[in-house]
Amino acid sequence: SAEYTEHWLATTNSTEKTDQGLTAYLALDDAFMSIASRIHLIRKAKHSIDLQYYIWNDDFIGHMMLHELLKAADRGVKIRLLLDDQNGTQLDESLQALATHPNFEIKLFNPYKYRKFRAIDYLFRLKHINHRMHNKLIVADGVIAVTGGRNISREYFDASESFQFTDLDILFFGDAVKNANQTVIQFWNDDLSYSVQQWSGQGTKQQVERSRQHYLQDTQSHNDL
Protein backbone atom coordinates (compact mmCIF):
# COMPACT_ATOMS: atom_id res chain seq x y z
CA SER A 1 0.00 0.00 0.00
CA ALA A 2 1.35 3.40 -0.96
CA GLU A 3 1.01 6.53 1.15
CA TYR A 4 -0.15 9.28 -1.19
CA THR A 5 0.95 12.86 -0.53
CA GLU A 6 -2.08 14.13 -2.45
CA HIS A 7 -5.22 12.76 -0.84
CA TRP A 8 -8.62 13.89 0.40
CA LEU A 9 -7.42 14.41 3.99
CA ALA A 10 -4.29 16.39 3.13
CA THR A 11 -4.01 19.81 4.80
CA THR A 12 -0.97 21.74 5.97
CA ASN A 13 -1.92 21.09 9.60
CA SER A 14 -2.56 17.35 9.15
CA THR A 15 0.73 16.90 7.29
CA GLU A 16 2.62 18.65 10.08
CA LYS A 17 0.96 16.48 12.74
CA THR A 18 1.79 13.30 10.83
CA ASP A 19 5.39 14.44 10.36
CA GLN A 20 5.59 14.88 14.14
CA GLY A 21 4.65 11.21 14.58
CA LEU A 22 1.16 11.95 15.92
CA THR A 23 -2.00 9.93 15.31
CA ALA A 24 -5.61 11.04 15.60
CA TYR A 25 -8.10 8.32 16.50
CA LEU A 26 -11.80 7.82 17.20
CA ALA A 27 -13.27 4.88 19.11
CA LEU A 28 -16.21 3.35 17.24
CA ASP A 29 -18.33 1.51 19.80
CA ASP A 30 -21.57 2.24 17.95
CA ALA A 31 -22.24 -0.39 15.27
CA PHE A 32 -23.85 2.06 12.83
CA MET A 33 -20.94 4.49 13.07
CA SER A 34 -18.55 1.61 12.56
CA ILE A 35 -20.05 0.36 9.28
CA ALA A 36 -20.65 3.97 8.16
CA SER A 37 -16.97 4.76 8.72
CA ARG A 38 -15.90 1.87 6.51
CA ILE A 39 -18.29 2.91 3.75
CA HIS A 40 -17.17 6.53 4.02
CA LEU A 41 -13.53 5.49 3.55
CA ILE A 42 -14.47 3.44 0.49
CA ARG A 43 -16.50 6.26 -1.06
CA LYS A 44 -13.85 8.93 -0.43
CA ALA A 45 -10.80 6.91 -1.53
CA LYS A 46 -9.08 8.26 -4.63
CA HIS A 47 -6.19 5.84 -5.16
CA SER A 48 -6.30 2.59 -3.20
CA ILE A 49 -8.24 0.53 -0.68
CA ASP A 50 -6.64 -2.39 1.16
CA LEU A 51 -8.75 -4.78 3.23
CA GLN A 52 -7.94 -7.84 5.36
CA TYR A 53 -10.68 -9.82 7.12
CA TYR A 54 -11.08 -13.11 8.93
CA ILE A 55 -14.84 -13.40 8.30
CA TRP A 56 -16.73 -11.90 5.37
CA ASN A 57 -20.20 -13.39 5.23
CA ASP A 58 -22.48 -13.87 2.24
CA ASP A 59 -25.16 -11.63 3.76
CA PHE A 60 -26.52 -8.09 3.49
CA ILE A 61 -23.50 -6.47 5.17
CA GLY A 62 -21.06 -8.47 3.06
CA HIS A 63 -22.96 -7.63 -0.13
CA MET A 64 -23.18 -3.93 0.74
CA MET A 65 -19.43 -3.73 1.30
CA LEU A 66 -18.65 -5.61 -1.91
CA HIS A 67 -21.03 -3.33 -3.82
CA GLU A 68 -19.26 -0.23 -2.46
CA LEU A 69 -15.86 -1.70 -3.34
CA LEU A 70 -17.02 -2.54 -6.85
CA LYS A 71 -18.23 1.03 -7.36
CA ALA A 72 -14.85 2.29 -6.12
CA ALA A 73 -13.06 -0.01 -8.56
CA ASP A 74 -15.28 1.32 -11.35
CA ARG A 75 -14.06 4.86 -10.70
CA GLY A 76 -10.41 3.77 -10.85
CA VAL A 77 -9.53 2.96 -7.23
CA LYS A 78 -7.19 -0.03 -6.84
CA ILE A 79 -8.72 -2.62 -4.49
CA ARG A 80 -6.80 -5.36 -2.68
CA LEU A 81 -8.95 -7.72 -0.61
CA LEU A 82 -7.37 -10.49 1.48
CA LEU A 83 -9.78 -12.94 3.13
CA ASP A 84 -9.02 -15.85 5.40
CA ASP A 85 -10.31 -19.05 3.81
CA GLN A 86 -12.17 -19.98 6.98
CA ASN A 87 -15.15 -18.26 5.30
CA GLY A 88 -16.08 -21.33 3.29
CA THR A 89 -17.08 -21.38 -0.36
CA GLN A 90 -20.33 -19.34 -0.26
CA LEU A 91 -18.64 -16.27 -1.74
CA ASP A 92 -16.57 -18.11 -4.34
CA GLU A 93 -18.67 -17.10 -7.34
CA SER A 94 -18.78 -13.45 -6.23
CA LEU A 95 -15.03 -13.36 -5.60
CA GLN A 96 -14.30 -15.01 -8.94
CA ALA A 97 -16.42 -12.37 -10.65
CA LEU A 98 -14.94 -9.38 -8.83
CA ALA A 99 -11.39 -10.57 -9.47
CA THR A 100 -11.96 -10.18 -13.22
CA HIS A 101 -12.26 -6.41 -12.71
CA PRO A 102 -8.96 -4.74 -13.71
CA ASN A 103 -8.90 -2.73 -10.46
CA PHE A 104 -9.89 -5.54 -8.08
CA GLU A 105 -7.35 -8.05 -6.70
CA ILE A 106 -8.50 -10.75 -4.29
CA LYS A 107 -6.46 -13.28 -2.36
CA LEU A 108 -7.31 -16.10 0.06
CA PHE A 109 -5.12 -16.65 3.09
CA ASN A 110 -4.10 -20.25 3.76
CA PRO A 111 -6.82 -21.81 1.57
CA TYR A 112 -8.05 -25.29 2.32
CA LYS A 113 -6.63 -27.86 -0.07
CA TYR A 114 -9.95 -29.71 -0.10
CA ARG A 115 -12.18 -26.65 -0.07
CA LYS A 116 -15.51 -28.48 -0.47
CA PHE A 117 -14.55 -31.40 1.79
CA ARG A 118 -12.78 -29.59 4.59
CA ALA A 119 -12.99 -32.49 6.99
CA ILE A 120 -10.14 -34.04 5.01
CA ASP A 121 -7.93 -31.04 5.79
CA TYR A 122 -8.81 -31.26 9.48
CA LEU A 123 -7.99 -34.96 9.53
CA PHE A 124 -4.68 -34.89 7.68
CA ARG A 125 -3.47 -31.27 7.60
CA LEU A 126 -4.62 -29.88 10.95
CA LYS A 127 -1.31 -28.28 11.94
CA HIS A 128 -1.09 -26.43 8.63
CA ILE A 129 -4.74 -25.47 8.29
CA ASN A 130 -4.99 -24.19 11.87
CA HIS A 131 -2.80 -21.19 10.95
CA ARG A 132 -5.48 -18.56 10.35
CA MET A 133 -5.44 -14.78 9.71
CA HIS A 134 -7.62 -12.91 12.20
CA ASN A 135 -6.90 -9.41 10.84
CA LYS A 136 -9.80 -6.95 10.55
CA LEU A 137 -8.48 -3.91 8.71
CA ILE A 138 -9.36 -1.42 5.98
CA VAL A 139 -6.89 1.25 4.80
CA ALA A 140 -7.89 3.99 2.35
CA ASP A 141 -5.25 5.72 0.23
CA GLY A 142 -2.60 4.51 2.66
CA VAL A 143 -3.43 7.34 5.10
CA ILE A 144 -6.58 6.48 7.10
CA ALA A 145 -7.76 3.17 8.50
CA VAL A 146 -10.30 1.29 10.60
CA THR A 147 -9.37 -1.75 12.65
CA GLY A 148 -10.84 -3.55 15.65
CA GLY A 149 -12.99 -6.51 16.57
CA ARG A 150 -15.69 -6.45 13.91
CA ASN A 151 -15.76 -8.84 10.99
CA ILE A 152 -17.94 -8.19 7.93
CA SER A 153 -21.20 -9.85 8.94
CA ARG A 154 -24.68 -8.81 10.09
CA GLU A 155 -24.09 -9.86 13.70
CA TYR A 156 -21.33 -7.26 14.13
CA PHE A 157 -23.41 -4.27 13.00
CA ASP A 158 -26.80 -4.64 14.73
CA ALA A 159 -28.29 -5.98 11.50
CA SER A 160 -29.08 -9.54 12.57
CA GLU A 161 -32.53 -10.65 13.66
CA SER A 162 -31.14 -13.40 15.90
CA PHE A 163 -28.18 -12.08 17.92
CA GLN A 164 -25.53 -9.34 17.99
CA PHE A 165 -21.88 -9.13 18.93
CA THR A 166 -20.65 -6.19 20.99
CA ASP A 167 -17.33 -4.97 19.64
CA LEU A 168 -15.10 -1.93 19.35
CA ASP A 169 -13.29 -0.48 16.34
CA ILE A 170 -10.80 2.35 15.98
CA LEU A 171 -10.74 4.88 13.14
CA PHE A 172 -7.24 6.35 12.94
CA PHE A 173 -5.29 8.83 10.82
CA GLY A 174 -1.64 9.75 11.12
CA ASP A 175 1.67 8.11 11.84
CA ALA A 176 0.20 4.80 13.10
CA VAL A 177 -1.24 4.10 9.65
CA LYS A 178 2.33 3.35 8.54
CA ASN A 179 2.16 0.21 10.70
CA ALA A 180 -1.16 -0.71 9.11
CA ASN A 181 0.40 -0.37 5.66
CA GLN A 182 3.25 -2.65 6.71
CA THR A 183 0.72 -5.23 7.91
CA VAL A 184 -1.06 -5.03 4.55
CA ILE A 185 2.16 -5.66 2.63
CA GLN A 186 3.32 -8.43 4.98
CA PHE A 187 0.16 -10.51 4.67
CA TRP A 188 -0.53 -9.72 1.01
CA ASN A 189 2.93 -11.00 0.03
CA ASP A 190 2.91 -13.94 2.44
CA ASP A 191 3.54 -17.38 0.97
CA LEU A 192 0.15 -18.48 2.33
CA SER A 193 -1.74 -15.81 0.34
CA TYR A 194 -3.03 -17.11 -3.00
CA SER A 195 -5.00 -15.35 -5.72
CA VAL A 196 -8.65 -16.36 -5.70
CA GLN A 197 -8.34 -17.56 -9.31
CA GLN A 198 -5.79 -20.19 -8.25
CA TRP A 199 -8.21 -21.82 -5.84
CA SER A 200 -11.76 -21.15 -6.97
CA GLY A 201 -11.43 -20.53 -10.69
CA GLN A 202 -11.78 -17.69 -13.16
CA GLY A 203 -14.87 -15.50 -13.33
CA THR A 204 -16.52 -13.80 -16.29
CA LYS A 205 -17.71 -10.28 -17.08
CA GLN A 206 -21.27 -11.61 -17.09
CA GLN A 207 -20.77 -12.76 -13.50
CA VAL A 208 -19.58 -9.28 -12.54
CA GLU A 209 -22.79 -7.73 -13.84
CA ARG A 210 -24.93 -10.37 -12.13
CA SER A 211 -23.12 -9.71 -8.87
CA ARG A 212 -23.52 -5.96 -9.32
CA GLN A 213 -27.30 -6.28 -9.75
CA HIS A 214 -27.58 -8.73 -6.86
CA TYR A 215 -25.68 -6.44 -4.48
CA LEU A 216 -27.77 -3.45 -5.56
CA GLN A 217 -31.07 -5.26 -5.03
CA ASP A 218 -29.99 -6.66 -1.67
CA THR A 219 -28.80 -3.25 -0.47
CA GLN A 220 -32.01 -1.53 -1.61
CA SER A 221 -34.15 -4.15 0.11
CA HIS A 222 -32.48 -3.33 3.45
CA ASN A 223 -32.72 0.45 3.31
CA ASP A 224 -34.72 0.38 6.54
CA LEU A 225 -31.76 -0.93 8.54
What kind of feature is each model-predicted range?
Residues S1-H131, A140-L225:
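Charged, low-complexity intrinsically disordered terminal segments
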Residues H134:
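Histidine-centered active-site/metal-ligand motif
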